[in-house]
Amino acid sequence: MPAPRYRSRSYRRIYRRTPGGRIVIHYKRRKPGKPKCAICGAELHGVPRGRPVEIRKLPKSQRRPERPYGGYLCPRCLKRLMIQKARNL
């Protein structure tokens, strides 16, 4: 029986064949869901999908787009927001 921490489905079960021919189970943390736009809910491109520890290892330029609200709003919603802010000035 697996250790208690591995009994939940928080971990993915990956079946691997060892060099000796046995099948063993490796437990891996699941990837988080894809990042979504805060306004329309569309999937954000250019933002990696990984656990925080994996994303922390990436260079800053690969973590999210380098524009205002990058990694938070999609380009379409950002365009609308900028136009709206300019009109309210």
From Swiss-Prot:
Protein's name in the database: Large ribosomal subunit protein eL34
Family: Belongs to the eukaryotic ribosomal protein eL34 family.
GO biological process entries: translation
Keyword match Ribosomal protein: yes
InterPro entries: Ribosomal_eL34, Ribosomal_eL34_C_sf, Ribosomal_eL34_CS, Ribosomal_L34e_arc-type
Residue runs in coiled coils: none
MF annotations from Gene Ontology: structural constituent of ribosome
An annotated GO cellular component: ribonucleoprotein complex
Organism: Methanocaldococcus jannaschii (strain ATCC 43067 / DSM 2661 / JAL-1 / JCM 10045 / NBRC 100440)
Cysteine-cysteine disulfides: none
